[in-house]
From Swiss-Prot:
Gene this protein is translated from: UGT74F2
EC numbers: 2.4.1.-
Family annotation (Gene3D superfamilies): Glycogen Phosphorylase B (3.40.50.2000)
Residue sites binding UDP-alpha-D-glucose per the record: 273, 325-327, 342-350, 364-367
SUPFAM superfamilies referenced in this protein's UniProt entry, alphabetically: UDP-Glycosyltransferase/glycogen phosphorylase
Species of origin: Arabidopsis thaliana (Mouse-ear cress)
GO terms of molecular function: benzoic acid glucosyltransferase activity; nicotinate-O-glucosyltransferase activity; salicylic acid glucosyltransferase (ester-forming) activity; salicylic acid glucosyltransferase (glucoside-forming) activity; UDP-glucose:4-aminobenzoate acylglucosyltransferase activity; UDP-glucosyltransferase activity
Protein name: UDP-glycosyltransferase 74F2
Induction description: By auxin, abscisic acid, salicylic acid and the bacterial pathogen P.syringae.
Protein purpose: Glycosyltransferase that glucosylates benzoic acid and derivatives. Substrate preference is benzoic acid > salicylic acid (SA) > 3-hydroxybenzoic acid > 4-hydroxybenzoic acid. Catalyzes the formation of both SA 2-O-beta-D-glucoside (SAG) and SA glucose ester (SGE). Has high affinity for the tryptophan precursor anthranilate. Catalyzes the formation of anthranilate glucose ester. Is the major source of this activity in the plant.
GO cellular component terms, semicolon-separated: cytosol
Keywords, ordered alphabetically: Glycosyltransferase, Transferase
Keyword Transferase attached: yes
Miscellaneous comment in the UniProt entry for this protein: Plants overexpressing UGT74F2 show increased susceptibility to the bacterial pathogen P.syringae and reduced accumulation of free SA upon infection.
């Protein structure tokens, strides 16, 4: 009887933006009655030092770089090759270890960046499902490129509103990051053999794109992967993200400061855990936000790019510059008026589900396409215009966009729209909602194995 509970081994690509949605999905599966084990690379495990007492088990696998992670690999190609070799073996070891237990592993949910995990699952007769951490729209464009040998013809018949500058950067900047482009295309090399394809989105947000992609594979949208306490509140213990590679020792100062600011008055500025701005762009951004009350997260690796003397001139009562922030708590604070974002998918989903309008400054990969949807499809913000030759967003354009979102004529419409998306996100997670139903479908398949 215990075997019928089902046991999912979840294998994320070892970066913060992938680990977080996997961890959150594991919480949903545990809530639905499945046993879940999250597989972290040895290097990430040692970096995070996670609490092992919770209901979700943690296991370690090897990517071949146990002492230094990706940064110690000679290239992305070498890293992926070694991850496949070492990862396949160590995942198989975990499966074999559990075979004689009360809860043998019955399913592998693997990051779509790691398609070889499907072969490991099939070797042991397990359910296998890739998890795409980017939205349906972006994945569909990558899929079209994959079946056309890496090329993409515009206009896209099913998505005619997309222009070159709206596409992922691999298309708009030809030849950029070839190894990463190959990685996103390889997501589809065997995905038609999977039991389902899981996507971190929700049906109402991408109804058309979901239908398009569902013609090629059995798509289940299982997002938003935001802690339950902020949305449906069905999982009382799910109060926040709890596996962080980047973390401050004290969150309270930031939140206490926000609590002193007027409602809707603060511009929250954050560019995620990977985006790197040029010195020129940092100078333009610093000049633009100086005219507002702001909370700006500048990672340690980016701090030296700030204009000389900028930090000393920041009025601590009006504005803050931090190395890290508890983003969920920040976005849910009434003081936040808009989110100036790089449009990474996790940040975009968080803003939509917290009802915070966005000023979009996309940098690379899926971000330009997310920005297009933010402005023209979901009508939840504006995209900052950039210089054609340099690609730099000038201070005047940034300032104009912030004003447009905070106080312009379209501001009320944007705020109304983001509230609509928040309400639909909550509805999708409530009992009988689209995401809740999709998770039930997945759970039934795992339990039947």
């Amino acid at each position: 009887m215990e075997h019928k509970r089902g046991h999912v081994l979840a294998v994320p690509y070892p970066t913060q933006g992938h680990i977080t949605p996997f961890r959150q999905f594991c919480k949903r599966l545990h809530f639905k009655g499945l046993k879940t084990t999250l597989a972290l690379t040895t290097f990430v495990f040692n970096s995070i030092n996670p609490d092992l007492s919770g209901p979700i088990s943690i296991a370690t696998i090897s990517d071949g770089y146990d002492h230094g992670g990706f940064e110690t690999a000679d290239s992305i190609d070498d890293y992926l090759k070694d991850f496949k070799t070492s990862g396949s073996k160590t995942i198989a070891d975990i499966i074999q270890k559990h075979q004689t237990s009360d809860n043998p592993i019955t399913c592998i949910v693997y990051d779509a960046f790691l398609p070889w995990a499907l072969d490991v699952a099939r070797e042991f007769g397990l359910v296998a499902t890739p998890f795409f951490t980017q939205p349906c729209a972006v994945n569909y464009v990558y899929y079209l490129s994959y079946i056309n040998n890496g090329s993409l013809q515009l206009p896209i018949e099913e998505l005619p509103f997309l222009e070159l500058q709206d596409l992922p950067s691999f298309f708009s900047v030809s030849g950029s990051y070839p190894a990463y482009f190959e990685m996103v295309l390889q997501q589809f090399i065997n995905f038609e053999k999977a039991d389902f394809v899981l996507v971190n989105s929700f049906q109402e947000l991408e109804l058309h794109e979901n239908e398009l992609w569902s013609k090629a594979c059995p798509v289940l949208t299982i997002g938003p992967t935001i802690p339950s306490i902020y949305l449906d509140q069905r999982i009382k213990s799910d109060t926040g993200y709890d596996l962080n590679l980047f973390e401050s020792k004290d969150d309270s100062f930031c939140i206490n400061w926000l609590d002193t600011r007027p409602q809707g008055s603060v511009v929250y500025v954050a560019f995620g855990s990977m985006a790197q701005l040029t010195n020129v762009q940092m100078e333009e951004l610093a000049s633009a936000v100086s005219n507002f009350s702001f909370l700006w997260v500048v990672r340690s690796s980016e701090e030296e790019k700030l204009p000389s003397g900028f930090l000393e001139t920041v009025n601590k009562e009006k504005s803050l510059v931090l190395k890290w922030s508890p983003q969920l708590q920040v976005l849910s604070n009434k003081a936040i008026g808009c989110f100036l974002t790089h449009c990474g998918w996790n940040s975009t989903m968080e803003a939509l589900t917290f009802g915070v309008p966005m000023v979009a400054m996309p940098q690379w990969t899926d971000q330009p396409m997310n920005a297009k949807y933010i402005q023209d499809v979901w009508k939840a913000g504006v995209r900052v215009k950039t210089e054609k030759e340099s690609g730099i967003a000038k201070r005047e354009e940034i300032e104009f966009s912030i004003k447009e979102v905070m106080e312009g004529e379209r501001s009320k419409e944007m705020k109304k729209n983001v509230k609509k998306w928040r309400d639909l996100a909550v509805k999708s997670l409530n009992e009988g909602g689209s995401t809740d139903t999709n998770i039930d479908t997945f759970v039934s398949r795992v339990q039947s194995k």
